[in-house]
Regions:
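Conserved catalytic core of the tyrosine transesterase superfamily
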Residues: 1-203
Length: 203
């Protein structure tokens, strides 16, 4: 059987993200087997995207003119954060898109610094102009009103669409894949585990 073009083996980061593998379901009795909540689900670490998969998603979003999604995807890779929680002021200063910035993680309260690549800056510039966003707006506002940002549930759905769009199994990838992708690429290029740990906020 031919292997899927996107599913050839890849090295994993040599440390855990903290999520364990699913435990097998057990039975409470011979007549009434217990069905675990996680039966049939793939749990644990989500896979990082490979360079060609990142490229494939970018190309599809560009061709489809999905300006918001392209900016959101690029920033998710760069920042290793949920891009839906970014504000204009986090990214733009004095009318120019920053090359490097830092934001406070809502979940942990820790400050995360990251570089914004040229292709991300171009995507953000195009999206901000198209959406006519102001300094105090969310970078990716909810369609229900600019006072709210795109929800994490909506973001997860979009990630699923991007993954499915290039033929990858959605169950093996998720929003955490965005976080792990840049770290995985840096580790494969440098082999510097400590740098990757710091990049992901591990002390």
């Amino acid at each position: 059987m031919n292997s899927h073009p996107y599913l050839d083996p890849e090295p994993e980061l040599p440390f855990s993200s903290g999520a364990g593998d699913a435990l097998s379901a057990t039975s409470t009795s011979a007549s009434q087997p217990f069905r675990g909540w996680n039966r049939g689900r793939i749990l644990g670490q989500k896979r990082a995207l490979k360079p060609r998969e990142v490229w494939a998603i970018r190309v599809r979003l560009h061709i489809a003119r999905k300006l918001r999604d392209l900016a959101l995807f690029n920033l998710a890779i760069d920042s290793k954060l949920r891009g839906c929680e970014l504000r204009i002021v986090d990214i733009i200063q004095g009318g120019a898109i920053r090359t490097r910035t830092g934001v406070i993680q809502q979940k942990t309260g820790a400050k995360v610094q990251f570089e914004i690549t040229e292709q991300s800056r171009e995507a953000v510039k195009t999206w901000v102009a198209k959406a006519n966003l102001g300094r105090d707006d969310w970078l990716f506002p909810s369609r229900n009103g600019r006072e709210k940002h795109l929800t994490t549930r909506q973001y997860a759905r979009l990630v699923g669409e991007w993954i499915e769009g290039i033929g990858l199994p959605v169950k093996e990838y998720g929003t955490h894949s965005m976080r792990r992708t840049k770290a995985s690429l840096i580790y494969r290029k440098t082999g510097n585990l400590r740098a990757v740990q710091l990049l992901l906020g591990h002390t």
